[in-house]
Amino acid sequence: MRHGTLRVDVVTIFPEYLEPLNVSLVGKARARGQLNVHVHDLREWTYDRHNTVDDTPYGGGPGMVMKTEPWGDALDSVLADGYETDAHGPALIVPTPSGRPFTQELAVELSERPWLVFTPARYEGIDRRVIDEYATRMPVYEVSIGDYVLAGGEAAVLVITEAVARLLPGVLGNAESHRDDSFAPGAMANLLEGPVYTKPPAWRDREIPEVLLSGHHGRIARWRRDEALKRTTANRPDLIERCDPSAFDKKDREMLSILGWFPDPDGVPHGRFWRRPEAMEE
């Protein structure tokens, strides 16, 4: 677990897009000094009267590419403030649909770093030489928040920052709150969180599951685990397929069997450990 304040720097041509970082849990974390966010306008490092940050791509093609000079000068300026080259220095986060998937596991990894610098791009992206240059100085994470394309990377910055910030010590009111999150490391790795309920116990003729009123912690834990398995098999079967059988106990395997999932020895070399009966017949 990390200690101290997490520093976040964001270089963007739309600083106002980052306003949501002033509200909710992230805003409170900033007010308490757990999160130190600096947003920088990339155009402050342009030197022509049009504040140009993009140009046509070499090799032709549609769209524009963000220029090396503004990005290089901006990052040099940001990094000059407290820059270190060891593990305690910054990591560069490049939001891009061509990056590695952003996962809860990666959020945990980033939450243990002291300093994150984001480069949300627009247009067709940033000239590749910028990324390659800073990769020689610090860890670079090219990260995608999904298999779709946005107009720019600022929305991804908001997503990643919130996912990371809520993992910082003291940000959540209850330190155990994220233990049972979907994808949380440990027992919930590769599983989606099941349904949750609160008062009143009955609403419009719909009652909460009786087990939740039983006070029996073991039965409640088993029910929650079964509901997580049900939801994951229904909504994200790909997650179940690649779960190592050793991650499941006897009761987990019984529930998976009821749901129509069985070990798939033939799939192990391909990273697939489970299959549904209909898939096994194909």
Curated annotation (Swiss-Prot):
It is an enzyme of class 2 (transferase). It catalyses: guanosine(37) in tRNA + S-adenosyl-L-methionine = N(1)-methylguanosine(37) in tRNA + S-adenosyl-L-homocysteine + H(+). One of its GO terms (molecular function) is tRNA (guanine(37)-N1)-methyltransferase activity. One of its GO terms (biological process) is tRNA N1-guanine methylation. Its EC number is 2.1.1.228. GO terms for cellular component: cytosol. Keywords: Cytoplasm, Methyltransferase, S-adenosyl-L-methionine, Transferase, tRNA processing. It is found in: Cytoplasm. Pfam families: tRNA_m1G_MT (PF01746). S-adenosyl-L-methionine binds at I145, G146, D147, Y148, V149, L150. Gene3D superfamilies: 3.40.1280.10, tRNA(m1g37)methyltransferase, domain 2 (1.10.1270.20). InterPro entries: Alpha/beta_knot_MTases, tRNA_m1G_MeTrfase_C_sf, tRNA_m1G_MeTrfase_TrmD, tRNA_m1G_MTases_N, tRNA_MeTrfase_TRMD/TRM10. Specifically methylates guanosine-37 in various tRNAs. Belongs to the RNA methyltransferase TrmD family. Homodimer. HAMAP family: TrmD. This is tRNA (guanine-N(1)-)-methyltransferase. It comes from Streptomyces avermitilis (strain ATCC 31267 / DSM 46492 / JCM 5070 / NBRC 14893 / NCIMB 12804 / NRRL 8165 / MA-4680). The gene is trmD.
